[in-house]
Amino acid sequence: MASAPNANGDAAVSDYDLMLKLAQNLDRHMIFPLLEFSAGQLVDEESGVVRDEAKAREITQAKYSLLKNSNMTDYVANLYCELAGVEEPPAEFADKKQKVFSQLQNLEQQTSKIIELLEREDVVNNLRSDKVANLEFLKREHQVTMDMVNALFDLGNLQYSCGNYGDASEMLYRFRVLSTDNDKVAFATWGRLACEILTMNWESAMEELVKVRETIDTKLSQNPLAQLQHRTALTHWALFPLFNFEKAREPILELFFNAGYINTIQANCPWILRYLAVAVITNRGRAKNPGIHQKQMKDVVRIVKQEAYEYQDPITRFVHALAIDFDFEEAQRQLVLAEEVLRSDFFLLAHADDFVDSARHLIFESYCKIHARISLKDLSARLGLNADAAEKWIVNLIRDTRLDAKIDYKEGTVVMNHPPSSVYQQVIEKTKGGFFRTQVLTAAIAK
């Protein structure tokens, strides 16, 4: 669970930092951008001065520990010099660099023939969807060996370890086209997903994400523990496209609300609720199907309520206060804290303003459902705005959403038009609901 509140009832923003929890489920190369973000948070925007030298050094040490076993030799050597206060790194760094260079040369020689073949149109035109047949064709006509194919895999891994993600992606793709080793193919697919994320090639990342999901669902169906672990990892990796690529929003939300993944979140990583709640709340007005968005919002509320004993932060507490407790004062208080948390979160910083605006819409909608006449002064307090800003915000909302409401400037109120629902209309709505449920039951019995 998130840190307990302090004496004033609030926890410090740093207490809601999810870095350690996220890092446990990310590849080391994916953790690096999060550390870079944390380092950037310590720099004063106006002066460029680092506010906390001790914390900055701690982050530099974390970068070094993270990457020292990678093959990013030059960068790791620079980190060492920064930490040790020296100008030249020890000879071991140069030795490792030479060793890595030799490995790259060796693997490039081993793969040069097969790469050349895969770039020839006459060869590619003879390849089919049957990998076994493709290998037989290449062995027979071009003397390709399995060692050559596996060398593509090794070269892709080495390029990745060096931080050459584009080259690594290409090698792993070529390997996957030819290999019949299911375990290595699965590993290569995860590798390509990582590469596409790190190069911010979001469309390709989404294609690889779908492939990884299919592998988890099919290949691991008889191994529940492994399936849980892989789904946990994929859930964390999916945060990168979710908050950086607009077209990824709906398919990834569909993934997260899939029974297998929502169970994974609840059982293994409840902190993902922060990201799920933000994604759903900020999706208002964007969702292609408003009905699906409403269902997702209800599901978020339900899960936040169920998992309150396991995980809480200002974002989930905002949802709880507004949609479960109907405590508007607490919702506004948590919204202020939530904005601070979002601005210190790697994935959510760019969505902080959008979240606050969407959250205010939710507060306004909820408040209007139970009041016919609302004081502008009272509403401005609920929204966390001054009187003028609140009035402007409400005017824009009424105009943009065609809300059936008007502002009474003389009385300083917002007047809501809640047309009474006739008994006849209520009976019709209930009959429709009963008829639909009967259809669902009939269909279920027929199956």
From Swiss-Prot:
**SUPFAM superfamilies, alphabetically?**
Winged helix' DNA-binding domain
> Taking every annotated instance into account, which residue ranges of this chain make up the domain PCI?
253-421
Gene3D superfamilies per the UniProt record, alphabetical: 1.25.40.570
Q: List, alphabetically, the InterPro entries matched.
A: eIF3e, eIF3e_N, PCI_dom, WH_DNA-bd_sf
Entry GO CC = eukaryotic 43S preinitiation complex; eukaryotic 48S preinitiation complex; eukaryotic translation initiation factor 3 complex, eIF3e
Question: Which keywords are on file for this protein?
Answer: Cytoplasm, Initiation factor, Protein biosynthesis
Protein's cellular compartments: Cytoplasm
Q: Which CDD domains match?
A: eIF3E
GO BP terms, alphabetized: formation of cytoplasmic translation initiation complex
Q: GO molecular function, one example?
A: translation initiation factor activity
- The main place the protein resides is cytoplasm
Is Cytoplasm one of the keywords UniProt gives this record?
yes
The UniProt subunit note reads as follows:
Component of the eukaryotic translation initiation factor 3 (eIF-3) complex.
Q: What does this protein do?
A: Component of the eukaryotic translation initiation factor 3 (eIF-3) complex, which is involved in protein synthesis of a specialized repertoire of mRNAs and, together with other initiation factors, stimulates binding of mRNA and methionyl-tRNAi to the 40S ribosome. The eIF-3 complex specifically targets and initiates translation of a subset of mRNAs involved in cell proliferation.
Q: So what family is this one in?
A: Belongs to the eIF-3 subunit E family.
Name used for this protein in its record: Eukaryotic translation initiation factor 3 subunit E
Q: Which organism is it from?
A: Chaetomium globosum (strain ATCC 6205 / CBS 148.51 / DSM 1962 / NBRC 6347 / NRRL 1970)
Gene name of the record: INT6
